[in-house]
């Protein structure tokens, strides 16, 4: 997808669902600008996703999100972010969205509050649910999320870390905390030596 625009292809900025034999192709969820990480929750088997927001609304907007994807969901792009907060269409490149229609306003009311919001431009990548026993009990079924960007790019926050997302299986009562940090030694892009992207657990639970 583009930074913010009205997609001409109805399958852009979506999640598509297929049967195991590749038949039954259909749009499952819409309004995802850049959903990089996808994972099934080990308890509920629901699909979770990470999303990267647009870039021209400053260092603090919009927040990135992690959320559960359910059939028919509208996740906000290209109209709103956070929870039904309109994007800034006074920014010149975003004016191509205008005019905002009644259909847009109705669609925006379907935008749900995400399980978790994190600082703008953190660039959440992979999401991995931990089912091992190597870590303390609270990590069982928690989600590890990799963030490959932060302050050295556009964000006003450090970033460049792997965080642990704790919540109930339905996504409520979510909290997020750093798990692995130290990939950024200073404040510039040259000071970043690691860009976390994906994670996996081994049979030993590490």
Regions found by a protein language model. Give the residues of each.
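Blade-level signature of beta-propeller repeat domains, shared across WD40, Kelch, NHL, RCC1
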Residues: 200-206
């Amino acid at each position: 997808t583009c930074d913010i625009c009205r997609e001409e292809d109805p399958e852009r900025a979506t999640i598509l669902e297929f049967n195991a034999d590749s038949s039954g192709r259909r749009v499952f969820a819409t309004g995802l600008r850049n959903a990089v990480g996808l994972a099934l929750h080990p308890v509920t088997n629901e699909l979770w996703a990470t999303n990267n927001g647009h870039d021209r609304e400053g260092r603090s907007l919009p927040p990135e999100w992690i959320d559960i994807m359910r059939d028919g969901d509208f996740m906000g792009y290209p109209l709103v972010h956070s929870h039904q907060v309109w994007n800034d269409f006074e920014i010149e490149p975003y004016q191509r969205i205008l005019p905002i229609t009644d259909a847009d306003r109705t669609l925006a009311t379907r935008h749900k509050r995400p399980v978790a919001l994190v600082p703008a431009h953190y660039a959440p990548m992979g999401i991995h649910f931990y089912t091992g026993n190597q870590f303390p009990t609270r990590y069982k079924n928690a989600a590890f999320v990799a963030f490959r960007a932060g302050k050295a790019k556009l964000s006003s926050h450090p970033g460049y870390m792997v965080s642990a997302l704790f919540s109930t299986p339905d996504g409520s009562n979510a909290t997020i905390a750093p798990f692995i940090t130290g990939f950024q030694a200073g404040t510039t892009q040259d000071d970043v030596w690691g860009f976390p992207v994906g994670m996996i657990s081994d049979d030993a639970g590490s």
